[in-house]
């Protein structure tokens, strides 16, 4: 279930609908887009500009492949940076705690 949204070189969106996907909004848009494409083919001067939408950005929106491509890489980088930050915070906390304990221990030795 899903559909592929494509962005062509003019910045216009077009999409290929998956036959297993049943979204009336997308079907209505697909129908209107097909009608616009047919109207463009009827007018030669418009057809020269919009004859074929050659996609250079493909965004695949499916239920199965949520973690694919660039999104997956960005999620991995985000988790990696989060882990580094947490590790640094924990290290600083442990260092400060040990330093405090050592200082308290030395102060108690000096008082005796």
UniProtKB/Swiss-Prot annotation:
Keyword Transmembrane attached: yes
Similarity-based family: Belongs to the asfivirus B117L family.
Upper taxonomic lineage: Viruses, Varidnaviria, Bamfordvirae, Nucleocytoviricota, Pokkesviricetes
Location(s) in or outside the cell: Host membrane; Virion
Superkingdom of this protein's organism: Viruses
Topology within the bilayer: Single-pass membrane protein
Protein name: Uncharacterized protein B117L
Main location: host cell
Any one annotated GO CC term: host cell membrane
Known glycosylation sites: 29, 60
Record flagged with keyword Ribonucleoprotein: no
């Amino acid at each position: 279930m899903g559909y592929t949204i494509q962005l062509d070189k003019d910045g216009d969106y077009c999409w290929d609908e998956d036959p297993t996907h049943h979204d009336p909004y997308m079907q209505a848009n697909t129908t209107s887009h097909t009608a616009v494409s047919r109207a463009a083919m009827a007018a030669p001067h418009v057809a020269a500009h919009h004859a074929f939408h050659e996609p250079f950005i493909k965004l695949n929106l499916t239920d199965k492949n949520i973690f694919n491509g660039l999104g997956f890489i960005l999620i991995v980088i985000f988790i990696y940076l989060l882990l580094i930050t947490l590790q640094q915070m924990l290290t600083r906390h442990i260092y400060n705690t040990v330093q405090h304990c050592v200082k308290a221990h030395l102060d108690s030795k000096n008082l005796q």
